[in-house]
UniProtKB/Swiss-Prot annotation:
Official protein name in the record: Phosphate acyltransferase
Subcellular locations according to the entry: Cytoplasm
Subunit annotation: Homodimer. Probably interacts with PlsY.
One GO process term, biological-process aspect: fatty acid biosynthetic process
Keywords for this protein: Cytoplasm, Lipid biosynthesis, Lipid metabolism, Phospholipid biosynthesis, Phospholipid metabolism, Transferase
Pfam annotation, one family: FA_synthesis
Function according to Swiss-Prot or TrEMBL: Catalyzes the reversible formation of acyl-phosphate (acyl-PO(4)) from acyl-[acyl-carrier-protein] (acyl-ACP). This enzyme utilizes acyl-ACP as fatty acyl donor, but not acyl-CoA.
InterPro entries: FA_synthesis, Phospholipid_synth_PlsX-like
Reactions accelerated catalytically: a fatty acyl-[ACP] + phosphate = an acyl phosphate + holo-[ACP]
Similarity field: Belongs to the PlsX family.
GO MF annotations in UniProt: phosphate:acyl-[acyl carrier protein] acyltransferase activity
GO cellular component, one term: cytoplasm
Pathway it works in: Lipid metabolism; phospholipid metabolism
Amino acid sequence: MKKIKILLDTMGYENTLEHVIKAAKDFYYQHEDDLEIILVGNEQLIKPLLDNDWRLFPIVHTEVSIEQNDTILSARKKQNSSMHLALRYLKDKQANGMLTAGNSAVFVYNAYATIGLLEHIKKPAFMPFVPTIDGGVTNLLDVGASIDLDGRDLFNFAIMANTIAKMRTPNPRVGVLNIGTEDHKGLPYHQEANELLKTSNLNYVGFVEPKTILEREVDVLVADGFSGNIALKTMEGVGKTISNFLKNEYKKPKNLFAALLSKPIFKKMKKAFDYKEHAGAFVLGLDGILVKTHGSADYQQFMSALKILYETIKADVLNEIKKDLNNYYGQ
């Protein structure tokens, strides 16, 4: 059986190395029959954490790291960084996919420069999975990789995200993020995307307002990187604010009884919206499977991101995306 090979960038994030190495070990043992995880980073730091398992994990050694405060310009001076090395390995087809928790802007830029775009694609997109109230997810893209987009870009994003959504849902519903649901609403690129999607064979439902994102009105929601990023961060901020408010209120003696009664409900709500279960965001539009997780990722988030990457590679999603794009563009 041909093994799936995953490159795991172990450097440049805010948490300790123990989290990523433990996740690598545990995930490997869940799929050891068809999986190889290549660790990219400082071998002297990695090996002691692997203990007796070090022979099971190829290591690409480097002591150079792209830090969270690096800029695209400063990162160019670090060509031997773990991120650069992993991307070059992926470009050379020495692995099937890559996971990093490193600097987002630098990662997208270097992935674009190293891997290159798919045919028909002009811009890359970040696509996280947004947890919804019914326990499902909405594929939201773009959330910051590309700002200056046109309707054709949004159309292409919808095609690619739809391919991934089909892993979970047979006939994904697709929408465009807008300030209203009426056809006349939005900017010219909204109108262009709307017309293109209406004439496609995607299950297009039209414009979607931000207020319904968490209700999973659609399975795929496309936006420009500016609007998508604001929507995502607003949801994250509101969730954090509500959580902090409730914690402070329930600490008050007069609310103790109410806190005890409502604890199961809020525990259920927390689980439904727990982003740690969906902690990987795809960089779509590039000729490779690339997943980015949070810069402060812990063990659980690395496990979640590895699962997303592994399942996507196993389903041959990159080739499915290429086929779907070629079908739309007549090749």
